[in-house]
């Protein structure tokens, strides 16, 4: 049985808004697995438990570059919020985004071998680490060069969106802002990844089973929950953030605009922040001193 620490309970509470005791019970049942505990709470408390599922812990920036119909969106990570605002780090991020758009590297390793002002990206990164005194990495990038129109939207430097479209640029820009705010996972319900659907279905089945309803009604509850989820996470089905009386699809149709694809990056999304156990560290130091 894994030890359930106060910091684990606090982290789960921050993610879910669930009562402390419920968080502790869920962690105990999940044997200390935070992700599993969050799922258990979602089953018990409903979707409120997922309100902060996208809250991130790692620091860094998202940078964008567009030149005509070619563009790139990149995420670079660092250790602290302070460094994410550093001028040298921001300038490096902007140059990396431009390099991705113009040179079309296959992956981060290939990107690292390209040059900025005659010096490799990797050497530039290493020099910047030495100058600033903090580790930083190029995490991911998306490149567009399909001949379609492009717009980007940056919410500060922590959320970045690129949209490929045909039609009205103002409408496409509105879609980019909408994506940053509502965080859809796909264009349409049909494109939602199967693993996400399976996860939602599993949660819905557990909730339906606990409801004690007859099998036929429970099955309808499950299907209803899944369909509701698909509408909530697919861009075209979402209520438009600037006018919730119409869906994004309806807004685009009225503007005679087609969105072909989009990329959304949220800084640190999916990265677990290291939690220091100072009590254990002190105990280890004391033990080492006693041995000495």
Curated annotation (Swiss-Prot):
InterPro entries: EF-Ts_dimer_sf (IPR036402), Transl_elong_EFTs/EF1B (IPR001816), Transl_elong_EFTs/EF1B_dimer (IPR014039), Transl_elong_Ts_CS (IPR018101), UBA-like_sf (IPR009060). The keyword Cytoplasm applies. Associates with the EF-Tu.GDP complex and induces the exchange of GDP to GTP. It remains bound to the aminoacyl-tRNA.EF-Tu.GTP complex up to the GTP hydrolysis stage on the ribosome. Pfam families: EF_TS. Residues 80-83 are annotated as: Involved in Mg(2+) ion dislocation from EF-Tu. It comes from Cupriavidus taiwanensis (strain DSM 17343 / BCRC 17206 / CCUG 44338 / CIP 107171 / LMG 19424 / R1). It is found in: Cytoplasm. Keywords: Cytoplasm, Elongation factor, Protein biosynthesis. GO terms for molecular function: translation elongation factor activity. Its main location: cytoplasm. This is Elongation factor Ts. HAMAP family: EF_Ts. PROSITE patterns: EF_TS_2.
């Amino acid at each position: 049985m894994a030890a359930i620490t106060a910091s684990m309970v606090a982290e789960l509470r921050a993610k879910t808004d669930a009562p402390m005791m419920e968080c502790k019970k869920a962690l105990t049942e999940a044997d200390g697995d935070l992700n599993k505990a969050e799922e258990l709470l979602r089953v018990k408390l409903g979707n409120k438990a997922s309100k902060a599922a996208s809250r991130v812990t790692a620091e860094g920036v998202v940078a964008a570059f567009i030149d005509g119909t070619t563009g790139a969106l990149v995420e670079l990570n660092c250790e602290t919020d302070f460094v994410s605002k550093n001028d040298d780090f921001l300038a490096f991020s902007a140059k990396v985004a431009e390099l991705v758009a113009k040179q079309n590297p296959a992956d981060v390793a290939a990107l690292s071998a390209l040059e900025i002002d005659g010096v490799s990206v990797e050497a530039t990164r290493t020099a910047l680490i030495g100058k600033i005194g903090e580790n930083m990495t190029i995490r991911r990038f998306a490149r567009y060069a399909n001949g379609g129109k492009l717009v980007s939207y940056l919410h500060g430097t922590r959320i970045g969106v690129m949209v490929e479209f045909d039609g009205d640029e103002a409408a496409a820009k509105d879609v980019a802002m909408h994506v940053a705010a509502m965080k859809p996972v796909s264009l349409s319900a049909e494109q939602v990844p199967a693993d996400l659907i399976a996860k939602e279905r599993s949660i819905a089945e557990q909730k339906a089973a606990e409801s004690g309803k007859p099998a036929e009604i429970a099955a309808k509850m499950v299907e209803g929950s899944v369909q509701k989820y698909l509408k909530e996470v697919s861009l075209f089905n979402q209520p438009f953030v600037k006018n919730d009386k119409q869906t994004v699809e309806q807004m685009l149709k009225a503007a005679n605009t087609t969105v072909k694809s989009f990329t959304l990056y949220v800084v640190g999304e999916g990265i677990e922040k290291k939690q220091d156990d100072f009590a254990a560290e002190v105990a280890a130091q004391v033990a080492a001193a006693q041995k000495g």
